């Protein structure tokens, strides 16, 4: 029976059918690695969705940055509205890991800020994987970082049934063991409250509903689900499965074993420091670890508890830590891992372990942490790439690694469903590049189209932006200090024609879907390096491939080897696309989706609230608007539209002060 119900208004087209067939066949033949080489705008995401539906396995889709993860999450939610599409990225808004700088004798404490919504989504992902098979998880590099033991997590899980005998007091203690905190004042995610024989539990992995358990003596008489906002009953249940409030929750038996294991390791390490006559490190480690043990014994947690993860999971020293892969593979279940933009993602995954190990080794050496802290780490690249699952690498420009691993299991997706061609390209002398590009920009702007310009340095981007602004052009630039929300706002403004030219350095590559852009200019294209490598050039040139008038200008003094390879690949693809269009009588046409749909503009409620004279508004009317805005705010947060959610939150706060 099919696990996944793929919904789409259009069938596969262009090169999609043959790519789907070839890759699905390779996966069904149990090949470990396969690669999809798909050009920009060829519908790689839709191909991925079809492959998931055909292979009928839970899937993990990994990408190298949060912006692309959010984009993929939105698209897969639309493709699979009746399945469990989950989101798993870092839950930190801000994170400063603990570290020690010996030459300055400076210890930097860990400092972090956890995003409540992202934490909920992470818990939702792990609980879905433990309870269902029709799950697709969109994840960042966070999927490679350590988590609790999924089998221990299942042990802590509770199935609650109507009619079963349970001591009321023991039930409350069990909730505490599962990581839930009692709070009679602020009832929110991960908490419970008890009034008389009625216990309300707000699951940590759900912000829309809470569960009410009603006792009669020591018997569960009734289970109901309530809407968290409206406080009205939604449905009654015969039983409910309640998962722990944390992925690191463990039972009392495992907790006691962990404490004993930490004590044993501490004794060995203190003996080592004493033998080495390192009394400063001896006293430092003794004081810090004993304090942590006191906290763990009393509350089950301590600050920096992740550094003791090996003791709680039961792993041996240097053994591969538990991570999201273990939740996907629970009960020896088969699953598929899709690595999107693999040419960037795989090198990023490969560099994670070394940086983490370097920092923690210093902490261990100077007595700030036990050696077991080194086992709280991301996966090594070999551990990741040899996981017991199937891999599909997806990229317009795969590296040698992906192609070598996949051998003959490589599918090309060069023909776009829209008939659009890879852009024309032209090399021009870089001596007068600023003036020459200015003349080209005027022609593009006259056609009501947009321009992307990529430079090598931030200074050049700023100066170019300044020059063109002085010459009367509407221009802005993006740099690395701009956060994801502001970045999306700038891209939205470009599409809405609030300005015509966007200048950047390394921000104009993967994941930018801008059909309005018909001209991409690459300044100093002959300066060999990461930003002007074959892969970077092809990716950047691809930004002009969503417009029928797509054109790329490369300013250079010479044609480098990277440029030559990029030109050969682009020319090959364009020739193949032109031949296909000629045979099938297709005329390339720019496909522009409705901006309102694409950009998710959700201003209606705020406009209504602002238009009303709030100080004259009847209290009942004001409460009604607050309720509507609150509901919309939660929807926005659930859909990861945090910018709109924050605006709605601020508007609600203003209304409540009246």
UniProtKB/Swiss-Prot annotation:
Entry's Gene Ontology BP terms: nucleotide-excision repair; SOS response
Domain UVR: 623-658
Residues reported in the UniProt entry to bind ATP: 38-45
Entry GO MF terms: ATP binding; ATP hydrolysis activity; DNA binding; excinuclease ABC activity; helicase activity
UniProt xrefs under InterPro entries: Helicase/UvrB_N, Helicase_ATP-bd, Helicase_C-like, P-loop_NTPase, UVR_dom, UVR_dom_sf, UvrB, UvrB_inter
Domain of life: Bacteria
Stretches assigned to the Helicase C-terminal domain: 433-607
HAMAP family in UniProt: UvrB
Function: The UvrABC repair system catalyzes the recognition and processing of DNA lesions. A damage recognition complex composed of 2 UvrA and 2 UvrB subunits scans DNA for abnormalities. Upon binding of the UvrA(2)B(2) complex to a putative damaged site, the DNA wraps around one UvrB monomer. DNA wrap is dependent on ATP binding by UvrB and probably causes local melting of the DNA helix, facilitating insertion of UvrB beta-hairpin between the DNA strands. Then UvrB probes one DNA strand for the presence of a lesion.
Protein name: UvrABC system protein B
Record organism: Helicobacter pylori (strain HPAG1)
């Amino acid at each position: 029976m099919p696990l996944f119900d793929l919904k789409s208004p259009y069938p596969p087209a262009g090169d999609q059918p043959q790519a789907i067939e070839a890759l699905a066949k390779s996966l069904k033949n149990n090949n470990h690695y396969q690669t999809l080489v798909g050009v920009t705008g060829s519908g790689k995401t839709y191909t991925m969705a079809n492959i998931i539906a055909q292979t009928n396995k839970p899937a993990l889709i990994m990408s190298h940055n949060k912006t692309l993860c959010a984009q993929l999450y939105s698209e897969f939610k639309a493709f699979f509205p009746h399945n469990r599409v989950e989101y798993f990225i870092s839950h930190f808004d801000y994170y400063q890991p603990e570290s020690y700088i010996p030459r300055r004798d400076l210890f930097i404490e860990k400092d972090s800020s956890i995003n409540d919504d992202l934490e909920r989504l992470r818990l939702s992902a792990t609980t879905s994987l433990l309870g269902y098979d029709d799950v697709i998880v969109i994840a960042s590099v966070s999927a490679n970082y350590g988590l609790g033991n999924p089998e221990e997590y299942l042990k802590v899980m509770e199935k609650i049934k109507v009619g079963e005998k349970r001591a009321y007091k023991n039930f409350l203690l069990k909730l505490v063991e599962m990581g839930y905190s009692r709070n009679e004042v602020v009832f929110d995610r991960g908490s419970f409250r008890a009034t008389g024989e009625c216990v309300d539990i707000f699951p940590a992995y759900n912000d829309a509903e809470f569960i009410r358990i009603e006792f009669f003596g020591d018997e569960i008489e009734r289970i109901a689900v309530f809407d968290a906002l409206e406080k009205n009953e939604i449905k009654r249940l015969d039983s409910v499965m309640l998962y722990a409030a944390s992925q690191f929750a463990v039972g009392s038996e495992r907790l006691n074993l962990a404490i004993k294991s930490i004590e044993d390791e501490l004794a060995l390490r203190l003996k080592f420091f004493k033998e080495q006559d390192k009394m400063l490190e001896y006293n430092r480690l003794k004081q810090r670890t004993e304090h942590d043990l006191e906290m763990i014994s009393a509350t089950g947690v301590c600050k920096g508890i992740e550094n003791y993860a090996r003791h709680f999971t039961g792993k041996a020293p240097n053994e591969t830590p538990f991570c999201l892969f273990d939740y996907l593979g629970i009960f020896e279940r088969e699953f598929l891992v899709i690595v999107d933009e693999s040419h960037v993602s795989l090198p990023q995954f490969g560099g994670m372990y070394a940086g983490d190990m370097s920092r923690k080794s210093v902490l261990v050496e100077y007595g700030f942490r036990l050696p077991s802290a080194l086992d709280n780490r991301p996966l090594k690249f070999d551990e990741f790439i040899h996981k017991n699952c199937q891999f599909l690498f997806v990229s317009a420009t795969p590296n040698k690694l992906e192609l070598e691993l996949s051998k003959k299991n490589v599918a090309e997706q060069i023909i776009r469903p829209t008939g659009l061609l890879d852009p024309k390209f032209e090399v021009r002398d870089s001596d007068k590049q600023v003036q020459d590009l200015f003349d080209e920009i005027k022609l593009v702007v006259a056609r009501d189209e947009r321009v992307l310009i990529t430079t090598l340095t931030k200074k050049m981007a700023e100066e170019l932006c300044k020059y063109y602004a002085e010459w009367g052009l509407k221009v802005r630039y993006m740099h690395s200090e701009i956060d994801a929300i502001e970045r999306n706002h700038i891209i939205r403004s470009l599409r809405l024609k609030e300005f015509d030219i966007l200048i950047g350095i390394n921000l104009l590559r993967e994941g930018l879907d801008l059909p309005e852009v018909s001209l991409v200019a690459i300044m100093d294209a002959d300066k060999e390096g990461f930003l002007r490598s074959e892969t970077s050039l092809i990716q950047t040139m691809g930004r002009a491939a969503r417009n029928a008038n797509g054109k790329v200008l490369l300013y250079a003094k010479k044609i480098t080897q990277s440029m030559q390879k990029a030109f050969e690949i682009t020319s090959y693809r364009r020739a193949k696309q032109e031949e296909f269009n000629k045979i099938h009588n297709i005329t390339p046409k720019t496909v522009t989706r409705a901006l309102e749909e694409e950009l998710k503009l959700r201003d209606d409620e705020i406009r209504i609230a602002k238009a009303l004279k709030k100080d004259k508004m009847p209290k009942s009317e004001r409460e009604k608007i607050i309720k509507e805005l609150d509901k919309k705010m939660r929807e926005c947060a659930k859909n990861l539209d945090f910018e709109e959610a924050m605006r709605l939150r601020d508007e609600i706060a203003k209304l409540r002060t009246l």
